[in-house]
């Protein structure tokens, strides 16, 4: 049975939650063994897949979880706004570390390596390709290039202002166009994740609301301060 077919079964049984275990850089939680522990806890709680950034984190996580891992490498480049898995060597390193799915930036922006080249390299390793997109045009273009999974990950992050709410309209548009959509980006409540599924998402990735303790504490502190002012 193919990995996609296996995921279809898991999603039907468990609801389609993917947990992104990406601590804030230099956080006390930003250690491979802690990332792996969070991933294992997420798997035991019913997550159908895990999203991991960085080769060391992926290696540590691969050793303890059996669910599929979506791997990425983030870089801050001087000559490109693209941050997610921008180079062939990133794809190769993630494949060697044990990723099942490799996600790349799928936006139409200046980049060191074309999207189609990165997709071909992912498929060369026999892995599934996911593209993190920001618009319907991004997603449809990446689908035509052969990406098996389209993420709404970058919606709101390629514009001057980032909205507070997730982009359900993008999920719906891409789903209705025949894309296998992972809704991602600002899904901070169970209700928002459920809305994404109702809008046609194949699965939903949740990160900050589950694995970034600093963000969760900030949300509570902000709300509680407002209540007493």
Swiss-Prot record:
Protein keywords: Carbohydrate metabolism, Isomerase
Q: Which GO terms describe its molecular function?
A: N-acylglucosamine-6-phosphate 2-epimerase activity
Name the PANTHER family on file: N-ACETYLMANNOSAMINE-6-PHOSPHATE 2-EPIMERASE-RELATED (PTHR36204:SF1)
Protein's UniProt name: Putative N-acetylmannosamine-6-phosphate 2-epimerase
Query: What functional role does this protein have?
Result: Converts N-acetylmannosamine-6-phosphate (ManNAc-6-P) to N-acetylglucosamine-6-phosphate (GlcNAc-6-P).
GO cellular component terms attached to this protein's record: cytosol
Q: What is the lineage of its organism?
A: Bacteria, Pseudomonadati, Pseudomonadota, Gammaproteobacteria, Enterobacterales
Source species of the chain: Shigella sonnei (strain Ss046)
This protein's pathway reads: Amino-sugar metabolism; N-acetylneuraminate degradation; D-fructose 6-phosphate from N-acetylneuraminate: step 3/5
> Which top-level group of life is the source organism from?
Bacteria
What is the enzyme's class at the highest EC level? isomerase
Which family does the record claim for this protein? Belongs to the NanE family.
Q: Might you give the EC number(s) for this enzyme?
A: 5.1.3.9
NCBIfam families associated with the record: PRK01130.1
- Asked whether the UniProt record includes Isomerase among its keywords, one would answer yes
Bilayer-spanning residue ranges: none
Q: Which GO terms describe its biological process?
A: carbohydrate metabolic process; N-acetylmannosamine catabolic process; N-acetylneuraminate catabolic process
The chemistry this enzyme catalyses reads:
an N-acyl-D-glucosamine 6-phosphate = an N-acyl-D-mannosamine 6-phosphate
């Amino acid at each position: 049975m193919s990995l996609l077919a296996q995921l279809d079964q898991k999603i039907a049984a468990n609801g389609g939650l993917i947990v992104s275990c990406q601590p804030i850089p230099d956080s006390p939680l930003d250690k491979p063994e802690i990332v792996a522990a969070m991933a294992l806890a997420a798997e035991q709680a019913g997550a159908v897949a895990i999203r991991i950034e960085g080769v060391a984190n992926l290696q540590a996580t691969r050793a303890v979880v059996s669910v599929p891992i979506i791997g990425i490498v983030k870089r801050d480049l001087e000559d490109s706004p693209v941050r997610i898995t921008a180079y062939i060597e990133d794809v190769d390193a993630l494949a060697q570390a044990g990723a099942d799915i490799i996600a790349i930036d799928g936006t139409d922006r200046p980049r060191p390596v074309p999207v189609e080249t990165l997709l071909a390299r992912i498929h060369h390793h026999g892995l599934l390709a996911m593209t993190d997109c920001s618009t319907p045009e991004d997603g449809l273009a990446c689908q035509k290039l052969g990406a098996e999974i389209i993420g709404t990950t970058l919606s709101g992050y390629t514009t001057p202002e980032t909205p507070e709410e997730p982009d359900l309209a993008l999920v719906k548009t891409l789903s209705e166009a025949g894309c296998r959509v992972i809704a991602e980006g600002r899904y901070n409540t169970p209700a928002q994740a459920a809305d994404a599924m109702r809008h046609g998402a194949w699965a939903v990735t949740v990160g900050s609301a589950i694995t970034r303790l600093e963000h969760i504490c900030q949300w509570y502190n902000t709300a509680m301060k407002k209540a007493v002012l």
